[in-house]
């Protein structure tokens, strides 16, 4: 307490158990500071993406780790989309194999699995899904969207049409099949001379609600690791906040059972519902190596998020789920896009 009687909030939060007594006596939420910090971040940033044009030394570096006989803390899935030939496959190969492919082979459906370790020692099994940007694969591409955690939407800096297609084609598609999933806008081939203004890229990033805009070159390895380090750091930070919330929720339920339950009964009501909450663990899903069908799902409706407990910290800067007009069946989106195409008879 301060001399004038007001409460001073400590910067050290402590564990939920160590705060039980003070919480019950004063009604102070042990994670109130975390909530306020998240709200302040959202208010200050809004829809403004993090723009990375040069190398950013402040992004944590995730080092390669071995998957052999090792249990990871998290499973993460990244799906890469964009126009055909814009550099999606080269970006993935440059990251996973540390080399630039000399021969271009159009991708149909590929996925790569690797493991990385964060600076705080936690490991992440990272599944990278490559997709085909050509129109003939419009019906196959949605098979890669189930369980995606972050989307990389790519465009080539030397091709203005690929940037326009981000707004006109790729964002509507991913927003239909996986609404609310965070998007990172990636400008590839930054080693090539280009007259494209960065302002246009920033404007598109804001319009689609991207959490970041990163310029990279797979040929020179410029910012290649930065793209994935940025995605990994964003994913891990949100997962740790979710774990923190679930710990607080579990602590409150234990107190409720000791006091006889929130409904004044024996506490069976709380025990029953505590089993229904999803926890952040490796059983959330598994990524199978060298297969394209391990996450295949029925596409009769747009994908929704897992049945996690609603997070009081907000949506971490994502756009709210927008009702899609293409929810009749799985191929309504493709048919609608083809109807809009103009046919010119010469």
UniProtKB/Swiss-Prot annotation:
Positions contributing to GTP binding: 82-89, 130-134, 188-191
Propeptide: 344-346
Compositional bias of kind Polar residues: 16-25
Cross-referenced PROSITE patterns: RHO (PS51420)
Keyword rRNA processing set for record: no
Region (Disordered): 1-25, 259-294
Lipidation (S-geranylgeranyl cysteine): 343
Cysteine methyl ester: modified positions: 343
Name by which UniProt lists this protein: GTP-binding RHO-like protein
Organism this protein belongs to: Candida albicans (strain WO-1) (Yeast)
């Amino acid at each position: 307490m301060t001399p004038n009687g007001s409460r001073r909030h400590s910067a050290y939060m402590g564990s939920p158990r160590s705060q039980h007594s003070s919480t019950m006596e004063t009604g102070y939420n042990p994670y109130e500071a975390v909530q306020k910090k998240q709200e302040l971040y959202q208010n200050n940033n809004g829809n403004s993406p993090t723009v990375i044009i040069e190398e950013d030394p402040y992004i944590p570096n995730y080092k390669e780790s071995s998957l052999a006989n090792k249990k990871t803390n998290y499973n993460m899935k990244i799906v890469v989309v964009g126009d055909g030939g814009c550099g999606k496959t080269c970006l993935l190969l440059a990251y996973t194999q540390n080399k630039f492919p000399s021969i271009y082979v159009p991708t149909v459906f590929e996925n790569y699995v690797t493991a990385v370790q964060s600076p705080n020692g936690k490991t992440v099994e990272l599944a990278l899904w490559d997709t085909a940007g050509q129109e003939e694969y419009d019906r196959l591409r949605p098979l890669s969207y189930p369980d995606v955690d972050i989307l990389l939407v790519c465009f080539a800096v030397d091709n203005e049409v690929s940037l326009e297609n981000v707004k006109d084609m790729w964002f509507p598609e991913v927003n239909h099949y996986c609404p609310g999933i965070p998007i990172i806008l990636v400008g590839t081939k930054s080693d090539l001379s280009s007259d494209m203004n960065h302002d246009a890229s920033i404007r598109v990033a804001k319009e689609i609600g991207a959490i970041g805009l990163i310029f990279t070159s797979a040929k020179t390895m410029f910012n290649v690791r930065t793209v994935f380090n940025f995605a990994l750091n964003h994913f891990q930070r949100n997962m740790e906040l979710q774990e923190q919330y679930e710990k607080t929720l579990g602590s409150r339920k234990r107190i409720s059972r000791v006091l006889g339950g929130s409904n004044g009964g024996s506490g069976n009501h709380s025990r029953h519902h505590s089993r229904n909450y999803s926890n952040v663990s490796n059983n959330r899903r598994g990524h199978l190596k060298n297969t394209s069908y391990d996450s295949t799902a029925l596409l009769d409706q747009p994908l929704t998020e897992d049945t996690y407990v609603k997070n009081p910290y907000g949506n971490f800067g994502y756009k709210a789920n927008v009702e899609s007009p293409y929810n009749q069946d799985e191929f309504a989106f493709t048919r609608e896009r083809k109807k809009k195409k103009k046919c010119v008879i010469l």
